[in-house]
Structures are given as structure tokens and as C-alpha cells.
Amino acid sequence: MLRDTMKSWNDSQSDLCSTDQEEEEEMIFGENEDDLDEMMDLSDLPTSLFACSVHEAVFEAREQKERFEALFTIYDDQVTFQLFKSFRRVRINFSKPEAAARARIELHETDFNGQKLKLYFAQVQMSGEVRDKSYLLPPQPVKQFLISPPASPPVGWKQSEDAMPVINYDLLCAVSKLGPGEKYELHAGTESTPSVVVHVCESETEEEEETKNPKQKIAQTRRPDPPTAALNEPQTFDCAL
């Protein structure tokens, strides 16, 4: 009886240990598979490559061009090519990012017509929403009047919003209505307060300066009269032969 109970207990313990090991293996390998899936996710990679410093024969000879294109058609049958002869570059457009990645890994710095083939991924064109989230946004275009940011803002510095300047439009309107020799009543008088009237007058300093230092008038030089008598008299020339 005791042996049977011990045997059953050992069997249960072994079953528990085996199940625990299986669960641990599943957890470990499951996590590794998830990590591998994340590492092998090539959806963010571009689908185009740039081949730089391509041999000139690719742009001139048709056979060399077909030979160059055959290197990449192995990875994708729908691949297209854009040749830039002046820059000696070729843009290779694949239908899938996996094909572009394989071609980049296997053909980068391989020999082609005696030159090493340089392959680089093309820049990924992101949408406007993704670009706004991935880059630092500029500050809101708040109108600033007086305060400008420092040359090197310290850590934690924030732009303070200035209050709009107070403009007395009544005063500007009153000044615009003033004219020479006219008066303008700012405040009407009451029984207990006098009225405020503005009279526009000329500056006394300007009049004093004009009397002390009068402006000198420059007289124009008179044009001399032509010598009429000399022109009317006949002229004789003596010539000795």
C-alpha cells in the first residue's frame, strides 16, 4: 500500500515537472519567435535601392544594361530601373521590401565590370501624419512684439507671450483731425470742470533759427553774350607761297 502511494506520488511529481518544463520551453521559444518576427519585420524598409558609381557601359551598351538588370531580376520579376547617366546612378524599384533587402545584402560591394557595386536604400517617404509624430514640431505661430528668444536658450526655457501694446485710438483720431491754426476740444467743460482744448501752433525755435541764419540764395551765373561784332566782320587770311 505504501509503495503504491509513493509510486503514484512520484508519477504525479514527474508529470508536474514535465508540464512545468514544457510550459517554460513554450514561454521561452514563444517569446523568441515573437522577437524573431519583430526582427524580421521588413515592412518599414524601403522598396527601392540606389546603385552608385555604376560603370559607364551600363548607360551606353545594351548588353551591359541587360547584364546589370539580370542581377536584380533574380530577386523580383517585377523590378523596374531608372537610369541617371549624368550621376552614374541607377534606381532599382522592387515590389516588396524583402526583395530589396536581400539584393542589398547579397549584391552590395560585389564586382561588376571591374568595379565594386555600391547599393544603398532609398529614403522612405512617410505620410504627413507619421512625419508630424516622428519629428519635433515647431512652436505655434504666436505673434510676438518685443521679447525675442535668446541665442542659446537654457534647459527648460519657454517663450513668454507678450501682451498686445495698448494703442489709444481716440488720441490718434484726434491728432489726425488737427490742422494748422485750428483747435480741437478734447473734453467738454461742465459746471465744475473746464474744457480741454488743443491749439496747434508753429514752433518758435524754427522761426528764431530762420531769423538768425537766413538761407543764402545762390544767384545763377549769367551766360555771356556772343561776340556779334567779331562774327559780322570779314576775316582775311594771308598765305605766303
From Swiss-Prot:
InterPro entries reported for this sequence: Calcipressin (IPR006931), Nucleotide-bd_a/b_plait_sf (IPR012677), RBD_domain_sf (IPR035979)
Job of this protein: Inhibits calcineurin-dependent transcriptional responses by binding to the catalytic domain of calcineurin A. Could play a role during central nervous system development.
Complex and partners: Interacts with protein phosphatase PPP3CA/calcineurin A.
A single Pfam family, by name?
A: Calcipressin
Q: Which CDD domains match?
A: RRM_RCAN3
Give positions of region: Disordered: 1-23, 202-241
| Biological processes annotated in GO | anatomical structure morphogenesis; calcium-mediated signaling
**Can you name this protein?**
Calcipressin-3
